[in-house]
Structure formats: structure tokens, C-alpha cells
Amino acid sequence: LSIQHLEPIRFHHFAHSYVRGNWQSAKKTTPLILAKACHDLDIVRWLLNKPCKQVTAFGDLSFFKRQNEPAGAADRCEDCAVESQCPFSAQRIYVKQHRYLYVFDNLPKDRAAKDIKIKEYLRTTDYGRCVFRSENDQVDHYVCNMQFEDQVTASMSVEAMTSSGGRKTRIMGTKADIVGDMKTFTLTDFLTGKQYIWDEDISKLPGYEGHAGGDWGIMKDFVLAVANHDEKYLSSTIDVS
């Protein structure tokens, strides 16, 4: 009858990729729904295997903008008077926690030397800018409601302000529901109350690092289809997607 799907981005991931990072501008790159949630839409469409008939969507950039900056804020976190109290601090995310260091080239292996180099990058790139003073225009919360053929409904939320990541899905049928995330799925039978649990660690599978296999899978299909001049290798067509 219905599906609920959540894509929780995590607050520091959103700040890194969609406020400071390469995808900070929907106008220059692509909207958040495509940049972050295209695989999620594919999952919903694949589960239902029906054409979507109607869509309503709402989203906005509500938090990461100038009027929400704290007193004492500066253009860069290095110069900010309240940096130590900010969960989005570039010093906290990159220097102290060493997250997302793949964006910085030629970092030394030695921890002290590495931190010095990271701080140099933060002085000269967007990754060191205040999240309230960046050139971002991506929405930081987004909801989408869809009606599919046979009156089946689905809702999807894409949220910046979450403490954890990983897709979460609830499928509601007439005889049971299924609740799951990126690792565990639980089916509960309405009549008997019996639960069936699937617990599978897929993190070691090829290509998992690319959005849990989504990037790897779609490119594999595309390359095989082009190389063999045969669309049978495609798990989905452009019309469906």
C-alpha cells in the first residue's frame, strides 16, 4: 500500500558536500534530489515496479544562511570567536576528526605535518569557510510525496540535520510490514505477530563504497550495454529512471 523512505545525510556530511563542497550550488551542479537522492528514488521505484502518476515536493534552504550565523562568526572558522561551540566547524571536522580528507591533495602521513597542511587548505579553499557565509543554495531539508499506479503511495525525506546516516525504509503491505536500513530488515506478520529478520553485512561487496554499490552497479550496467551494443545489460532504462 505504501512506502516511507528516509535519506539521513548527517549534519557534517551535508556541511562538507552541500554547503562548502563541490555540490554547494544547485544552479552550478545539480539539485540535492539528484545529487544525493537519485539512488533513493530508484529504490522506491524498483520496490513498487509501477509508474509514478503524481508527485508533490517541498524543500528549502532554511538554516545554512547568513541570518542564522551566531554572534562572533567570521568568514572562516579559523578566525571565528565561537568556533569551538560550532558542530560545523571546519577545524573540528577536518583537523580534529580527520573527516573527508580525500579532498586535500598530497597530505603527509605524519599526523602533525598533516594537520599543518590541512590548516593551509582551510585558509585558501571553501572547506575553511563559515557554513553560514558560503555560496551555497542547496535545500537543507526536502520531502517528496508520490502516487503510483493502483493508488500506491510513497514518501521520501532527504534531511541534512541528522546524527547518523544510512537509508531507512518502511514498507507497509496488507498482511505485513517490513522495516529496514542498510543492514537489517524485519518483516512482521500482522496475523501471527511472527517476525522474520534478515541481517546481512554487504559492506565488503565490490563497489560498496560508492553509495552502497549504487554508483558501481549503474556504471557496470552502462559500460556492458555500450560495449556489447545490447540493452539487456541495463537493470533500468532511462524512461523508468
Question: Where on the chain are the PLM-derived regions?
Answer:
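C-terminal helical cap and adjacent loop that interface with cofactors, partners, or active-site loops
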Residues: 138-241
